């Protein structure tokens, strides 16, 4: 009995050569629509789908393969006499191979001119149904959704006239992933269209971006997946201009870095980061000076770190960065001279180019945190804060310079691991206390790090001070201005301590925990 394949693809890469080889192996080919036209034009003889169904394509192609002559041919078990008899009684011929990929729904909704009606018309119905039928009956039917699998299938058919069960099972799993991801993307689109903030089912599609050597540690296996609907401002979308492949830890650190720099849009800014904590942030009228400040903030910790700049990297800035061992540099662009400097004898330095004009779109994405047996979902911490809404709770008002420095510090503290303390002036970070289990411990660490630069410095805390001992430590170090959320039942004790030492203190009313 001549074996039959059904081919209906939107991605026609390689399909003509594949179909020609099938014909050479003695297969009949059923096809539909544009695929049939392409194969016929290439001289590949095909059978029209309506010759199989006895029913014409209708409703602008919405109904063409949803027919017992198709699905019976796919689903009939070859080891079940009753199935084979039912097929014979109803003149259903068996189909042994299905090659289908689906209407380009993703590509359609990514078009800037897409309309709702166009998106709906690009939801495939018959394709997923055929794939699921073929995949369910993989004991006998081979299902192919990816042109990358054409060679394997043809090779096995040429060798043994059929594919192996192992291959059919693998391809069935791939087909089910394909249809599941397709439906998840449609669900994601419709959920957004109706503004459903808390859907009872969460379905998000990710595509494999990179198989990684290992994860956070060498004993951990890892991979990097990119959202099927990508954000341009993301490490997954960055263009790598130089260097080794990004590691698991590189990607996490780089992601943290590009989140921080989003809050410093107005002025040229450089962020240096290590282990997802900023070790230096510098802000100036030009990017070279901003680099100087970020480097001077902690010239020890920046070694082996990640640097992100929010302006084009020029030759002067590149010349200062080049002698330092850095893992990654990220910027919106690089001058030709800068790129030549940075890549000179630095073949491993990872240099990434990222479209900073897409930052706003990245801020609306939800954050996902895996826990054992579950997933936490939250909005990003991108609340708009207006300094005019902040409250000075002490007798002394901040000076103009202190106010500027406090705004800078408040932007920076949001990205320090809790319990987080940061000491800055109006243009650079000076000391950092991160990740301590008590707040006064973070205060002491930050003061120790900044001890030689405390003249005119200010301090920010990501959450309220639970006791006045924090204020006493700060005052003893000579720091005169504090910014914190407030909200402790002992706030008045902290206010009284600040007044006693002549400090100025602002309550923002917004906490910025970061775990």
Swiss-Prot record:
UniProt pathway: Purine metabolism; IMP biosynthesis via de novo pathway; 5-formamido-1-(5-phospho-D-ribosyl)imidazole-4-carboxamide from 5-amino-1-(5-phospho-D-ribosyl)imidazole-4-carboxamide (10-formyl THF route): step 1/1; Purine metabolism; IMP biosynthesis via de novo pathway; IMP from 5-formamido-1-(5-phospho-D-ribosyl)imidazole-4-carboxamide: step 1/1
SUPFAM superfamilies linked to this entry: Cytidine deaminase-like, Methylglyoxal synthase-like
The entry's keywords: Hydrolase, Multifunctional enzyme, Purine biosynthesis, Transferase
Disulfide bonds: none
Catalytic function, reaction form: (6R)-10-formyltetrahydrofolate + 5-amino-1-(5-phospho-beta-D-ribosyl)imidazole-4-carboxamide = 5-formamido-1-(5-phospho-D-ribosyl)imidazole-4-carboxamide + (6S)-5,6,7,8-tetrahydrofolate; IMP + H2O = 5-formamido-1-(5-phospho-D-ribosyl)imidazole-4-carboxamide
Pfam family membership, one: AICARFT_IMPCHas
GO cellular component term, pick one: cytosol
HAMAP family: PurH
NCBIfam families: PRK00881.1, purH
Protein name stated in the entry: Bifunctional purine biosynthesis protein PurH
Species of provenance: Streptococcus agalactiae serotype Ia (strain ATCC 27591 / A909 / CDC SS700)
Gene: purH
């Amino acid at each position: 009995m001549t074996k039959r394949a059904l081919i209906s693809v939107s991605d026609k890469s390689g399909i003509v050569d594949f179909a020609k080889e099938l014909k050479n192996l003695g297969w009949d080919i059923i096809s539909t629509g544009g695929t049939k036209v392409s194969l016929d034009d290439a001289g590949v003889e095909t059978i029209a789908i309506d010759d199989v169904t006895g029913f014409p394509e209708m409703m602008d192609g919405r109904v063409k393969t949803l027919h017992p002559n198709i699905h019976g041919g796919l689903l009939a078990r070859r080891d079940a006499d009753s199935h084979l008899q039912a097929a014979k009684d109803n003149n259903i011929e068996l189909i042994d191979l299905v090659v289908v990929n689906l209407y380009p729904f993703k590509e359609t909704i990514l078009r800037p001119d897409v309309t709702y009606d166009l998106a709906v018309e690009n939801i495939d119905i018959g394709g997923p149904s055929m794939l699921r039928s073929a995949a369910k009956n993989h004991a006998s039917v081979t299902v192919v959704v990816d042109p990358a699998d054409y060679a394997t299938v043809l090779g096995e058919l040429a060798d043994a006239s059929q594919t192996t069960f192992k291959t059919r099972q693998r391809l069935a799993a791939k087909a089910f992933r394909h249809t599941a991801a397709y439906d998840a993307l449609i669900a994601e689109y419709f959920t957004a269209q109706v503004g459903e903030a808390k859907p009872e089912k969460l379905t998000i599609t990710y595509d494999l971006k990179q198989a990684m050597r290992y994860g956070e540690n060498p004993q951990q296996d890892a991979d990097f997946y990119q959202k099927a609907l990508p954000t341009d401002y993301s490490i997954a979308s960055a263009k790598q201009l130089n260097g080794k492949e990004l590691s698991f830890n590189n990607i996490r650190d780089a992601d943290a870095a590009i989140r921080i720099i989003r809050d410093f849009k107005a002025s040229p800014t450089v962020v240096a980061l290590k282990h997802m904590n900023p070790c230096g942030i510098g802000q100036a009228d030009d990017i070279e000076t901003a680099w100087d400040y970020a480097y001077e903030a902690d010239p020890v910790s920046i070694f082996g770190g990640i640097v992100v700049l929010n302006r084009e990297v020029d030759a002067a800035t590149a010349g200062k960065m080049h002698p330092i061992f850095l893992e990654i540099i990220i910027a919106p662009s690089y001058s030709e001279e800068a790129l030549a400097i940075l890549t000179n004898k630095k073949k491993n330095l990872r240099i990434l180019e990222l479209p900073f004009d897409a930052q706003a779109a990245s801020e609306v994405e939800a954050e996902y945190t895996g826990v054992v047996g579950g997933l936490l979902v939250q909005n990003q911490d991108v609340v708009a804060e207006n300094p005019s809404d902040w409250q000075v709770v002490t007798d002394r008002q901040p000076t103009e310079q202190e106010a500027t420095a406090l705004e800078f510090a408040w932007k920076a503290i949001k990205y320090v691991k809790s319990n987080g303390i940061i000491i800055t002036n109006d243009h650079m970070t000076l000391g950092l206390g991160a990740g301590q289990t008590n707040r006064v411990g973070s205060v002491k660490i930050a003061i120790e790090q900044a001890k030689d630069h405390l003249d005119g410095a200010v301090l920010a805390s990501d959450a309220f001070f639970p006791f006045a001992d924090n204020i006493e430590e700060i005052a003893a170090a000579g720091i005169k201005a504090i910014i914190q959320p407030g909200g402790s039942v002992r706030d008045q004790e902290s206010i009284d301590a600040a007044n006693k030492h002549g400090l100025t203190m602002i309550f923002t009313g917004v906490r910025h925990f970061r775990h």
